[in-house]
Amino acid sequence: MINQIIQSPRLTRVCESIVNAVFPRSCVGCGLNRKDGGDYLCGLCRDDIFVIGDPLCETCGIPADIDYDYPAEGFECGWCRKGGFRFDRARSLGLYDSVLKELIHFYKYRNQPGAINEIEPYLRDYFETCREEYQGYSVASVPLHVKKLKERGFDQSFVLAHKISEILDLPLLTRPIRRIRETLPQARKNRTERFQNVRKAFDVVDAEAVLEKNILLIDDVFTTGSTVNEVTRMLKQARAGCVQVFTLARA
């Protein structure tokens, strides 16, 4: 009887439907078969993720323009030379290009928190080279507004922060910051509008948890840096120590 149930074509179709709902048949990056790849990307797209390396701005981590006359060491972009950010340093895993962009969109908007596992090997390789720089830090994430959290079903930055805290073996601060104001979408706003849009959108709700603590602040994408900059402002207002930022992608 049990063998008949296991071999049932109907049960097989149901199982296949469940698997396909969780893991897409085609590659999220290119739409082709996921041959030689993982659960979300094919082998070629996994290899095509562009991991950011030197030369880059020492403060915000933006890759240096190859046509720019930058020094071998100590390069700072124009914005950072003006003292444009409140965080101490920011780094991103890769460029927000076609593959990483599609994977992040799938991760965020298709309720697929498991997609972060596709990037885990890159995260481990990245932090293996700079683990000492984050020793003594506590990990925190840029929070979603409660309304957006209910719509999405999970907080993508918190999931990422949890993964990074495991990789670095660092304590994870659970919700020391909250988003107290729902903000308009940033996509079509210029730099000035983005900074204004997130002004006073966050609050530190557990000041003791961040007091004199060095914080590794996690978010998914760094575009202008307005969001992580505003969260940093609130953390430092609550007397946090050094604040370093890490995002999956740099747009």
Positions of PLM-derived features:
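Glycine-rich phosphate/pyrophosphate-handling loop used in enzymes and phosphotransfer proteins
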Residues: 1-219, 223-251
